[in-house]
């Protein structure tokens, strides 16, 4: 019996050993598979990091003379810079308001473009969040400076019409020219853009229309609780709400949904590296800050002469102040954005064109307009959001038309032509419109 039990025990031990070996092999294979998976993921991350390298801007080593050369002499538009000092000379020697206004208007044009350039250079060193705030602040600094000078002089209607004209110009003329030029270059197809972003922007513009529409309706229906004061109180309250909404929009754009607002290039890795190299700043951070200060001071100086000459230019040229404030001034302030939007559209980067045109309209309607109401509140000026019935209706119809054109998420040269023709109708309407506040107040 004992002899029979020995082989059985041996067989049991052999089976146990083989089972242990199988378990060890399976564990070893699992560890090996996990190691290979980790290595593969690391290799994939490494390949991604090499394909899309983190680009850090390299500060150029410029001298003062080289910085002056880059900012002043490397842009053909700066050939118009001498018109600014010439306007000041004409003001003191001839005192012709019409010529002072015209020369100042031309002299401010390159300064507005250089302000945008200096802002972009400084944004290269600050990162996307602060850079976005800089662009939001200095993107329409020319209109803000002109508006503050006019507000200081009590010319509330000039402030309202200038800001309104800038919104209309960006939505119709700038966007229309971008659609038209981009459509001519790519005439065989419809250019596409992000429909979701366009919907959010249209909603913000409609909110701005709401803030401007209700004080006008309250005024013309004579339904104020306290005549004269309820309209102003509503405007100031709505302005604070609009500023909060704009701050939330900036957070949404720069933080919460930053990926949606920074579309990736659909080109190859080589184009990605090329675009990263193009974003390297041309001047240093402190040079950009100094140039921003100089250009802002120069724009402020010329804006004072410009505002003083508006009424005289209107009389000498026999042109309504409403047309000068709504059409001529915004075209100068939007000159840089106009060129940038067209350039992006001709490169089939329509999201950037919309960011320039519609984004600037949002900045003015949701930031500049309520900001001027708050500044006027501090100055003791009774600026409100009642832009009068004609102007408010013009803004409302324009926003509806633009939102209708953006709802499909595509554009062509015909849509651009329609927007340009709409702007011509707006310009003609303001040319024959008699402003009830002829004194600018």
UniProtKB/Swiss-Prot annotation:
> How does activity shift as pH rises or falls?
Optimum pH is 7.0 for cytosolic pH.
- Kindly indicate where the leader peptide sits in this chain: none
Q: Do the record's keywords include Transmembrane?
A: yes
Q: How does it sit in the membrane?
A: Multi-pass membrane protein
Entry-linked InterPro entries = CaH_exchang, CAX-like, NaCa_Exmemb, NCX_ion-bd_dom_sf
Query: What does the record give as the function of this protein?
Result: Vacuolar cation/proton exchanger (CAX). Translocates Ca(2+) and other metal ions into vacuoles using the proton gradient formed by H(+)-ATPase and H(+)-pyrophosphatase.
Protein's recorded name:
Vacuolar cation/proton exchanger 2
Please report the organism this UniProt entry assigns to the protein. Answer: Arabidopsis thaliana
Q: What is the lineage of its organism?
A: Eukaryota, Viridiplantae, Streptophyta, Embryophyta, Tracheophyta
């Amino acid at each position: 019996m004992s002899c029979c039990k020995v082989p059985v025990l041996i067989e049991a031990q052999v089976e146990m050993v083989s089972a242990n070996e199988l378990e060890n092999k399976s564990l070893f294979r699992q560890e090996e598979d996990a190691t290979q998976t980790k290595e593969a993921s690391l290799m994939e991350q490494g390949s991604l990091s090499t394909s899309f390298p983190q680009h850090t801007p390299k500060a150029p080593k410029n001298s003062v003379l080289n910085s002056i050369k880059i900012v002043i002499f490397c842009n053909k538009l700066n050939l118009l810079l001498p018109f600014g000092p010439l306007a000041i000379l004409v003001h003191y020697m001839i005192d012709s308001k019409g010529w002072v206004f015209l020369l100042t208007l031309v002299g401010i044009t390159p300064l507005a473009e250089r302000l945008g350039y200096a802002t972009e250079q400084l944004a290269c060193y600050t990162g996307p969040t602060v850079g976005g705030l800089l662009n939001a602040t200095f993107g329409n600094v020319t209109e803000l400076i002109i508006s503050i000078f006019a507000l200081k002089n009590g010319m509330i209607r000039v402030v309202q019409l200038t800001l309104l004209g800038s919104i209309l110009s960006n939505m119709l003329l700038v966007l229309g020219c971008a659609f038209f030029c981009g459509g001519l270059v790519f005439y065989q197809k419809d250019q596409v853009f992000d429909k979701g972003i366009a919907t959010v922007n249209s909603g913000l513009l409609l909110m701005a229309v709401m803030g401007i529409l209700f004080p006008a309706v309250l005024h013309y229906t004579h339904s104020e609780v306290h005549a004269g004061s309820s309209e102003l109180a509503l405007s100031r309250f709505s302005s604070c709400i609009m500023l909060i909404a704009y701050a939330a929009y900036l957070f949404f754009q720069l933080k919460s949904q930053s990926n949606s607002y920074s579309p990736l290039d659909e080109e190859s890795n080589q184009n990605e590296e090329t675009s990263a190299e193009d974003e390297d700043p041309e001047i240093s951070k402190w040079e950009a800050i100094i140039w921003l200060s100089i250009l802002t001071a120069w724009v402020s100086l010329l804006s004072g002469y410009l505002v003083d000459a508006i009424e005289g230019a209107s009389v000498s040229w026999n042109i309504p102040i409403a047309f000068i404030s709504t059409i001529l001034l915004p075209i100068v302030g939007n000159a840089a954005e106009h060129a940038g939007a067209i350039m992006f559209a001709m490169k089939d980067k329509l999201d950037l064109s919309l960011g320039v045109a519609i984004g600037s309209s949002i900045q003015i309607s949701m930031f500049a307009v309520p900001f001027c109401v708050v500044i006027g509140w501090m100055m003791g000026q009774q600026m409100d959001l009642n832009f009068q019935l004609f102007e408010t209706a013009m803004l409302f119809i324009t926003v509806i038309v633009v939102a209708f054109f953006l709802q499909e998420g595509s554009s062509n040269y015909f849509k651009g032509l329609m927007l340009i023709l709409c702007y011509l109708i707006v310009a003609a309407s303001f040319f024959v419109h008699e402003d009830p506040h002829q004194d600018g107040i």
